[in-house]
């Protein structure tokens, strides 16, 4: 198998685990690691269902509608994907893309955890050294940015573009250094999306588009 051979070469010749990980992630997002079920619903129908569900959730949660970036009509795919897959933008599948509060809130000695980029380490959400805000402040902040289970967090400062699925059912607020992506997780697998965003292909796009935050 060419992919198995290439992965061994990366490991044996360069001893570079990060490059091996990148190779595996790229293979996964190209649909090369598992046999595809061509009898599944076609990509166009799947995308329509995702977009409809995303809009339904946006309305239900009373989230402000914003103009979405979609693929241009002359879009050229950078690589081949399985025939039952399709290309989309994050805007198309997310019903909200936002970030944490842009001002420093009043901290409390205990209360609701208030996370910043420093609390996302080694692929985990670390609550051991967080600041806290009051329940009242939390209720105010969540009107604009309300992290919930199966949403995705995305770092905006330092090493940008590192995603993390919220895999716990816990209340917390976010600072501006972390972005929040809300998806219809009954239609989009959040863990696959996390892998896609972690892939070298998407990281290159993120790097090219990073101009600063605030």
Task: Label each PLM-derived region with a short phrase.
Residues 1-7, 11-14, 19-27, 32-33, ...:
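Non-catalytic DNA-recognition/assembly elements of restriction-modification systems
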Residues 23-41, 50-53:
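A structural feature that tracks compact, well-ordered secondary-structure segments
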Residues 86-123, 138-142, 160:
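Low-complexity, Lys/Gly-biased intrinsically disordered segments
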Residues 116-117, 135-198:
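A short beta-sheet element
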Residues 196-214:
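Specificity-determining recognition surfaces
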């Amino acid at each position: 198998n060419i992919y198995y051979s290439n992965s061994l070469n990366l490991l044996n010749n360069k001893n570079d685990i990060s490059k091996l990980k990148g190779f595996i992630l790229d293979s996964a997002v190209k649909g090369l690691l598992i046999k595809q079920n061509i009898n599944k619903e076609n990509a166009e129908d799947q995308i329509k269902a995702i977009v409809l569900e995303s809009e339904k959730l946006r309305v239900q949660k009373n989230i402000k509608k914003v103009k979405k970036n979609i693929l241009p009509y002359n879009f050229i795919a950078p690589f081949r994907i399985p025939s039952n897959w399709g290309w989309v933008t994050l805007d198309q599948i997310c019903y909200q893309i936002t970030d944490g509060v842009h001002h420093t809130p009043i901290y409390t000695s205990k209360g609701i955890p208030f996370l910043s980029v420093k609390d996302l380490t080694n692929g985990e959400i670390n609550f051991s050294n967080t600041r806290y805000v009051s329940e009242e402040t939390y209720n105010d902040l969540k009107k604009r940015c309300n992290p919930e289970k199966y949403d995705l967090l995305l770092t905006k400062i330092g090493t940008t573009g590192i995603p993390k699925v919220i895999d716990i059912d816990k209340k917390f607020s976010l600072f501006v250094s972390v972005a929040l992506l809300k998806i219809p997780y009954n239609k989009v697998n959040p863990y696959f999306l996390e892998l896609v965003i972690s892939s070298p292909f998407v990281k290159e796009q993120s790097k090219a588009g990073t101009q600063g935050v605030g």
